[in-house]
């Protein structure tokens, strides 16, 4: 998937000026317009291939579907709650974020919230501003020796852990992805959730908002907590059930809460914000000069590197694409698309299971990034719903009635005895298998159904190929075929044959354009098909 034609980017939220400068220095045109309505945003995007947002702009399905040229949405921040990922993926629009940009700022705010909860600093400040001197009212608690439960041990969670350990806190946590060995390396003991609740003096959440994390803290879990537990949410509104939190505060089960995020922002229901034991901020987790600059810089660099084909970072909805930008993998992506296109032309809109098989040490983990490219080749001529690319390929292939499996073989798929890296694409249960490899940076076809080409056939983008199989070696065959090409006004550009396999030979002709029909070829060959990619 190439982004070289991405030329113009709209920045629709406030970002550090370095973002615009980096984009322009990278050769991109930049338009900055903020506070756009949905209709205004759609209008601006009619001439833009890229969009960069922070939190304010809502990139809905309506916006994505109406923006015909849109290729990439960049979120200068961690979450992508304001981008409709399903709609973007279906349309083949890449979504990126800056997962590292605001981690430190969010972690520091969390630590500040924990300290404010322990010593009631905001409440004491408000009291002083009212002219009061209430030393007894604001009795606090030390952090030393207390247990902090951290739910979500990614970048932010681990930064919080190391900082609060310096206050003498014991850190325990839970993360379904991070291994206990990894979390132990930064001082967090992982426990099951049901064991965490009764141990914690403080709980802080650092998970994405998913169906599995919505309402993670609820009436049931609050009931399992220590009486007087304190809760911090600087992650996403909705992870803590706001109704359950209010009830826990009112009953004293929860001694205090610090909230930077809400289910609705700004919150119209003020019951939580107005509670005397709640500290709240208007979503300030990433609101530092450093984070703003870092996020703006990172997303701009990601755009420029992507357009120049250097690298692809921060991908949210097509992680396999990241591998597609490595110098080693790029030509294999081209080969995979070519073999997918060949398979569709050969098998005629195949149904069932397509097998993608890799061989060779350097391709051991490449199946997940090569299979979308195979799908692009299979579907790009057939899909009536959308343009097929590496972003939406896996979604659209299911709707086309195809399953795609990937596997790695220590031995060559098809013809045995070759030690190089190979890629094979086959239709399960049917006599269709194509094998290719990369020579230098050129994808080449090595074999069809066990018939091996020596030398291999170059697969060049834009060069039509005509492939046909014959049973006998008739000296008059080649002049006859050239005559058929001439009758159709098509020139022969190259010609190669396979080694004889089971008494038959495959022939490959590079031709100046695809033939309007292969009917005239059928009396002379066992089978024939043509394609270009």
Swiss-Prot record:
Gene: PHGDH
Location of N6-acetyllysine modifications: 21, 58
Catalyzed reactions: (2R)-3-phosphoglycerate + NAD(+) = 3-phosphooxypyruvate + NADH + H(+); (R)-2-hydroxyglutarate + NAD(+) = 2-oxoglutarate + NADH + H(+); (S)-malate + NAD(+) = oxaloacetate + NADH + H(+)
Organism: Macaca fascicularis
A GO BP entry: L-serine biosynthetic process
Binding site residues for NAD(+): 78, 155-156, 175, 207, 234-236, 260, 283-286
EC nos: 1.1.1.95, 1.1.1.399, 1.1.1.37
Name of the protein described by the UniProt record: D-3-phosphoglycerate dehydrogenase
Pfam families: 2-Hacid_dh, 2-Hacid_dh_C, PGDH_inter
Positions bearing the Glycyl lysine isopeptide (Lys-Gly) (interchain with G-Cter in SUMO2) cross-link: 21
Top-level division of the source organism's lineage: Eukaryota
Key word Hydrolase present: no
Location of Phosphothreonine modifications: 78
Subunit description: Homotetramer.
């Amino acid at each position: 998937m190439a982004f070289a034609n991405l030329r113009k980017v709209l920045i629709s939220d406030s970002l550090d000026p370095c973002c615009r400068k980096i984009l322009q220095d990278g050769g991109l045109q930049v338009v900055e317009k903020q506070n756009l309505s949905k209709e205004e945003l759609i209008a601006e995007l009619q001439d833009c291939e890229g969009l960069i947002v922070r939190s304010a702009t809502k990139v809905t399905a309506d916006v994505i579907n109406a923006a015909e040229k849109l290729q990439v949405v960049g979120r200068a921040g961690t979450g992508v709650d304001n981008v409709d990922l399903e709609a973007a993926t279906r349309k083949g629009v890449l979504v990126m974020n800056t997962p590292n940009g605001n981690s430190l700022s969010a972690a520091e705010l969390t630590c500040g919230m924990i300290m404010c909860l322990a010593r009631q600093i905001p409440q004491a400040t408000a009291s002083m501003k009212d002219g009061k001197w209430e030393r007894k009212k604001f009795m606090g608690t030390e952090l030393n020796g207390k247990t902090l439960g951290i739910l979500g041990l990614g970048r932010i969670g681990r930064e919080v852990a190391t900082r609060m350990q310096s206050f003498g806190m014991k850190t325990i946590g839970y993360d379904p992805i991070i291994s206990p060995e990894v979390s132990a390396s930064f001082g967090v003991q992982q426990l099951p959730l049901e064991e965490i609740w009764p141990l914690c003096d403080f709980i802080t959440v650092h998970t994405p908002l998913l169906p599995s994390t919505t309402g993670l803290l609820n009436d049931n879990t609050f009931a399992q907590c220590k009486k007087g537990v304190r809760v911090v949410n600087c992650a996403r509104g909705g992870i803590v059930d706001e109704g359950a939190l209010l009830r826990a505060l009112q009953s004293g089960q929860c001694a205090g809460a610090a909230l930077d995020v809400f289910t609705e922002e700004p919150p119209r229901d003020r019951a939580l914000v107005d509670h005397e034991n709640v500290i709240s901020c208007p979503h300030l987790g990433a609101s530092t000069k450093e984070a703003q600059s870092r996020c703006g810089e990172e997303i701009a660099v990601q755009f420029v590197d992507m357009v120049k084909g250097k690298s692809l970072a921060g991908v949210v909805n097509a992680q396999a694409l990241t591998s597609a930008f490595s110098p080693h993998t790029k030509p294999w992506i081209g080969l995979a698309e070519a073999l997918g296109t060949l398979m569709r032309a050969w098998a005629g809109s195949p149904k069932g299971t397509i097998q993608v098989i890799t061989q060779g040490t350097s391709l051991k983990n490449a199946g997940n990034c090569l299979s979308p490219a195979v799908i692009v080749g299979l579907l790009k001529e057939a899909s009536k719903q959308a343009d097929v690319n590496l972003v939406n390929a896996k979604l659209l292939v299911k709707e086309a009635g195809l399953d795609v499996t990937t596997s790695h073989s220590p031995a060559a798929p098809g013809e045995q005895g070759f030690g190089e890296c190979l890629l094979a694409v086959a239709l399960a249960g049917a006599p269709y298998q194509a094998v290719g490899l990369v020579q230098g940076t050129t994808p080449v076809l090595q074999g069809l159904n066990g018939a091996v080409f020596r030398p291999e056939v170059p697969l060049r983008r834009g060069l039509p190929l005509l492939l046909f199989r014959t049973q006998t070696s008739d000296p008059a065959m080649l002049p006859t075929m050239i005559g058929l090409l001439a009758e159709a006004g098509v020139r022969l550009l190259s010609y190669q044959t396979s080694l004889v396999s089971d008494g038959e030979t495959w022939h490959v002709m590079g031709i100046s354009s695809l033939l309007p029909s292969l009917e005239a070829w059928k009396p002379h060959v066992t089978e024939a098909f043509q394609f270009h990619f």
